[in-house]
Amino acid sequence: MENCSSDAVVLHHFDYGEADRIVTLFSLEKGLIKGIARQARKSRKRFGAALEPFSTVHMRWQSRSGRDLVTLQDAELIDLRSGLRHNLLAMALAAYGCELVENLVGETGAQPPVYDLLTAFLTHVNHHGGSEEARLLLELRLLCLSGYAPHLVHCCKCGASFTSETVAFAASLGGSLCLDCVTGVDVQYLSLLSLGSLARALKAPLALFEGFRFGSQTLQQGGQVVSSMLRQQLTRPVKSLSFLSQLTEGSARVAAIR
């Protein structure tokens, strides 16, 4: 038996049996953790509000060799991020971000840069609400931290610099293509301006989400390119994406009417 503790983000939970709760966390010290909080629904003394999704906590647990679930002992709440529960779009985006981290990173052990990115993302959305910029930045940065950084500034086949205003992108090759190299490859097209915006975003600090203002074309084209890369790497669908897409489309229609 091993006693462990770490700061962690609560990704999600579900009730188990009459009083227990199964909790999935992404921790600073151990990465992805799944544990059982016994009697969590009957007694709030050990956990209180610390098992709420999107919260940052300091969690203590016991693990045993050969068992998938650790036993959660108690937790200290660091940041509840209560603002997310008053904004449906922000909450949906937070849920998507947490699920994306779980699916893309998986059980690969400690990944401090991913932990820092996730906490910065959740804090930003908690204070500023959901936005397409925040989603695009999270997706792009997660791809990079997971080893799938898109090749943007030169043709990924011939290495040439881009001279035309339109650039092709092949998710299957993981990067951009000049127009001379698109034969026989399934591609998407985006403007050189959009490509440059994505490249500049990758140079910014991982935890920085404020101050980004992408044009509508960059959001659309960049979002399509990043989504195609995510589909290449994810082994299962992101369930929360459907609800987030419904909310995002609804918000866009309302904005168009105003």
Swiss-Prot record:
Any single GO BP term: double-strand break repair
GO cellular component, one term: bacterial nucleoid
Keywords (A to Z) from UniProt: DNA damage, DNA recombination, DNA repair
UniProt entry tagged with the keyword DNA repair: yes
A UniProt-annotated Pfam family: RecO_N
Statement: the UniProt record of this protein carries the keyword Transmembrane helix: no
Gene3D superfamilies on file: Nucleic acid-binding proteins, Recombination protein O, C-terminal domain
Functional note: Involved in DNA repair and RecF pathway recombination.
HAMAP family the record matches: RecO
Family (UniProt): Belongs to the RecO family.
Protein's recorded name: DNA repair protein RecO
Source organism (scientific name): Syntrophotalea carbinolica (strain DSM 2380 / NBRC 103641 / GraBd1) (Pelobacter carbinolicus)
Lineage: Bacteria, Pseudomonadati, Thermodesulfobacteriota, Desulfuromonadia, Desulfuromonadales
